[in-house]
């Protein structure tokens, strides 16, 4: 099938390395630039999502593989420049080894991914414009 640039959901099971995660990896340059522009243009909405205490409880860090400096076309002194330095817009929540054997596992996964969905919806809204 065709690779989607949209945020996806990911469940990883590994001894001492299990996690619930999601995001968009390896975005084409034009889409990555558009996502950054969307964050910049709608920073209040983005911050309301990623700095919400319920969101941060599961996802304290946004992104992977960061630029060392501000991306081209964005002011270096932008208060939230770190959100624009992401090359991969992903979030992950590490879980203990016994997580997947707990009786409330599905409810817990639902809680985590409900928080992630707000982030995914924000990113996917921009990506939708490219389809």
Spans of model-derived segments:
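Aromatic- and glycine-enriched beta-alpha-beta binding-site module
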Residues: 1-40
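Surface-exposed, charged, gly/pro-rich loop-and-adjacent secondary-structure segments at domain edges
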Residues: 37-65
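Long, solvent-exposed, polar/charged low-complexity segments
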Residues: 38-40, 61-131
């Amino acid at each position: 099938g065709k690779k989607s640039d949209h945020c996806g959901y990911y469940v990883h099971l590994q001894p001492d390395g299990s996690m619930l995660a999601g995001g968009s990896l390896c975005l084409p340059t034009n889409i990555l630039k558009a996502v950054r522009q969307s964050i910049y243009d709608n920073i209040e909405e983005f911050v309301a999502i990623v700095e919400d205490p319920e969101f941060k409880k599961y996802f304290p860090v946004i992104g992977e593989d960061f630029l060392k400096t501000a991306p081209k076309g964005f002011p270096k002194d932008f208060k939230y420049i770190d959100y624009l330095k992401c090359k991969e817009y992903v979030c992950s929540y590490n879980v203990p080894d016994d997580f997947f054997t707990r009786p409330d596992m599905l409810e817990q996964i639902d809680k985590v991914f409900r928080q992630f969905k707000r982030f995914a919806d924000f990113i996917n809204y921009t990506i939708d414009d490219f389809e």
